[in-house]
């Protein structure tokens, strides 16, 4: 049940808060260019799922259909797995389909009906699944016969696990960029007509394209204009943190100012920040040229690697960027990744994504959106912000803790399917009782994701252990027993 946002004494109407700003800030926060948001991981995940569905439909081509439908071939026989619907609901339609299999002496191992996942108006509501063994030489003719009496004929081969990185070095392969908001391609990008800015972006992007795991992150010599943009964002946001940011963000931000070069007149270097994070929580930064695909980005989190941009937003729009930039990453994400519990929460989302279906990736991306990007939490009877999208956006940070949005208790099942807003501020936010509570709820949600295996991160080798056999589980259990032995010894020493 939605809960009113009354926990924070500093909460006030959003428009009232804006009216207390100077004219320049107020105009920026209320302008469409400020409110407009960059493309999210959710949108990318949704597009990937739609592409996969389109590819599945395209597999109705004869050659593709054969590849998708045949699970194995041996001794001149092929195991065929087919899904199809029938024209009309008459018994004769099914009889004609069965006759096609009989003609080619197919040995039917399994036949069942299933509800159509996305029934069309007036269309069939049942689909048929057939597993049969048929002479390999007759495959093309059989499929042709079935297609004459059935509709939507497609392969239903055994579920294949999608590739995912097993070693941290394999993140070098996870570099699929979403280019929708590239300043070279997006007419609405603030830097589209600025050739100097576009060339600068290409120069900085090349660092990410050339980077390999294990390399030190090259340093960027930022220009005076870039530092001025950083200063405006840095000072404006910092003035709100003391009243709006969660305790963990405030504590880490102070440490970053002391040890990692966080100050208004200098943009921190990723290599310095990465070393700081590694000492705190084991997270590392990796340079990226832009917005990664959802699957690649989430996979990186499984290794405690955060893909981080080095470029900065255009100087004409310091209070808004249509894409992630170093202001968003360094001011919003990095301080939170310095907290151990939050770092584990982030890694858990990444681990849950490995080998997951496109549909689950979309749900996990939505969860990421409403937690890591736009999450709220309770602290000392008040509601505070911990989401990076809030902590790097002056306007939305004010809005999220005002009286205007609806605040709901964090429930992963609800958050994973909650419609999100990318054209204006969110109308709904989810508040967690604590990071530990959010972590436990996320793990419960992830345990219900259907995969033929579990995964575990090995912090010694920076690799993913795939637990898909008794042997793999026993080997992992040995490590747990060693850790328990150490803890038991420590307890006895204290006692």
UniProtKB/Swiss-Prot annotation:
It comes from the Eukaryota. Its cofactor is Fe(2+). The keyword RNA-binding does not apply. Residues 41-53 have a biased composition (Basic and acidic residues). GO terms for cellular component: axon; cytoplasm; nucleus; perikaryon; perinuclear region of cytoplasm; synaptic vesicle. Residues 41-65 are annotated as: Disordered. Homotetramer. Interacts (when phosphorylated at Ser-19) with YWHAG; one YWHAG dimer bounds to one TH tetramer this interaction may influence the phosphorylation and dephosphorylation of other sites. It comes from Canis lupus familiaris (Dog). It holds the Pfam family TOH_N. Fe cation binds at residues 328, 333, 373. Catalyzes the conversion of L-tyrosine to L-dihydroxyphenylalanine (L-Dopa), the rate-limiting step in the biosynthesis of cathecolamines, dopamine, noradrenaline, and adrenaline. Uses tetrahydrobiopterin and molecular oxygen to convert tyrosine to L-Dopa. In addition to tyrosine, is able to catalyze the hydroxylation of phenylalanine and tryptophan with lower specificity. Positively regulates the regression of retinal hyaloid vessels during postnatal development. The modification Phosphoserine is found at residues 19, 31, 40, 469. GO terms for biological process: dopamine biosynthetic process from tyrosine; heart development; hyaloid vascular plexus regression; response to ethanol; response to hypoxia. Pathway: Catecholamine biosynthesis; dopamine biosynthesis; dopamine from L-tyrosine: step 1/2. Phosphorylated on Ser-19, Ser-31 and Ser-40 by several protein kinases with different site specificities. Phosphorylation at Ser-31 and Ser-40 leads to an increase of TH activity. Phosphorylation at Ser-40 activates the enzyme and also counteracts the feedback inhibition of TH by catecholamines. Phosphorylation of Ser-19 and Ser-31 triggers the proteasomal degradation of TH through the ubiquitin-proteasome pathway. Phosphorylation at Ser-31 facilitates transport of TH from the soma to the nerve terminals via the microtubule network. The record marks 422 as: Important for substrate specificity. This is Tyrosine 3-monooxygenase. Inhibited in feedback fashion by the catecholamine neurotransmitters, especially by dopamine in competition with tetrahydrobiopterin. Phosphorylation of several Ser/Thr residues in the N-terminus regulates the catalytic activity. Ser-31 and Ser-40 are readily phosphorylated to activate the catalytic activity. A Cysteine modification induced by N-ethylmaleimide (NEM), inhibits tyrosine 3-monooxygenase activity through the modification of the Cys-174. GO terms for molecular function: iron ion binding; tyrosine 3-monooxygenase activity. The lineage of its organism: Eukaryota, Metazoa, Chordata, Craniata, Vertebrata. CDD domains: eu_TyrOH. It is found in: Cytoplasm, Perinuclear region; Nucleus; Cell projection, Axon; Cytoplasm. Belongs to the biopterin-dependent aromatic amino acid hydroxylase family. The gene is TH. Keywords: Catecholamine biosynthesis, Cell projection, Cytoplasm, Cytoplasmic vesicle, Iron, Metal-binding, Monooxygenase, Neurotransmitter biosynthesis, Nucleus, Oxidoreductase, Phosphoprotein, Synapse.
